[in-house]
């Protein structure tokens, strides 16, 4: 029962159940025929939702596209590859995972014909953009298919695999690192080198390595995806 300040009592029955949050909370046309898609996660089937939203925006006359990945913590790797495939040709290597065992090493390529290889794209990112979101934004940057706008991303370049435990529990085990088209890994924290107290730190910029995009632009590994255009605040 719930009571108010006036001591009225309201009785409500609440049913506990699973709720599927939308992967695309909003999409629409902005001024100047700019299409906008807010992609909040990579759980479920976001590539299907994204495709439907994009095709609808095209019908409405969108001539350019903004993909908002701010605070998107990631999810399924293959879903990020699917969305990249909408904008780049078939047969492109998007992600390579490398682990200590053969089963943890894989290559993910674009397998289908794209939806649109010409529409101008801007991707919004911030420090909450992580994992599969960095695969999407970093791959589009490496292939010179989009302009990345905002702040440096989180820097999660590791792949975890869930293992079932008794009593319905799960344990996530890190099995590999992932590498995007330029060959770089965006992992920011160097777990291989710990401080005396056992803590770990981010890889300093001075120790990062230069890689190159398809058009020859310099990009760096470590520390996430750095934007092409840095903005302190995006409203």
Indicate where each model-derived feature is located.
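Active-site lining segments that contact anionic ligands and/or coordinate catalytic metals
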Residues: 118, 143, 168-173, 206-208, ...
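Conserved functional hotspot residues or short segments at active or partner-binding sites
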Residues: 182-231, 235
């Amino acid at each position: 029962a719930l009571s108010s300040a006036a001591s009225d009592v309201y009785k409500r029955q609440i049913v506990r159940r699973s709720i599927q949050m939308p992967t695309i909370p909003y999409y629409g046309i902005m001024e100047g025929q700019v299409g906008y898609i807010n992609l909040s996660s990579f759980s479920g089937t976001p590539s299907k939702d994204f495709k439907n939203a994009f095709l609808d925006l095209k019908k409405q006359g969108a001539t350019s596209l903004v993909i908002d990945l701010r605070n998107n913590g990631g999810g399924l790797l293959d879903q990020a590859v699917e969305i990249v495939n909408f904008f780049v040709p078939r047969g492109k290597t998007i992600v390579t995972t490398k682990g200590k065992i053969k089963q943890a090493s894989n290559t993910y390529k674009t397998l289908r014909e794209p939806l649109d290889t010409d529409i101008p794209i801007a991707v919004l990112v911030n420090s909450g953009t992580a994992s599969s979101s960095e695969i999407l934004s970093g791959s589009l940057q490496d292939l010179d298919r989009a302009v990345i706008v905002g702040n440096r991303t989180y820097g999660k370049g590791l792949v975890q695999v869930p293992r079932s435990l008794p009593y319905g529990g799960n344990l996530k085990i890190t099995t590999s690192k992932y590498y995007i088209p330029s060959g770089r890994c965006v992992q920011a924290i160097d777990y291989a080198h710990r401080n005396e107290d056992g803590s770990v730190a981010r890889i300093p910029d001075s120790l990062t390595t230069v890689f190159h995009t398809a058009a020859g632009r310099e990009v760096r590994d470590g520390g996430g995806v750095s934007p092409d255009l840095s903005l302190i605040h995006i409203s």
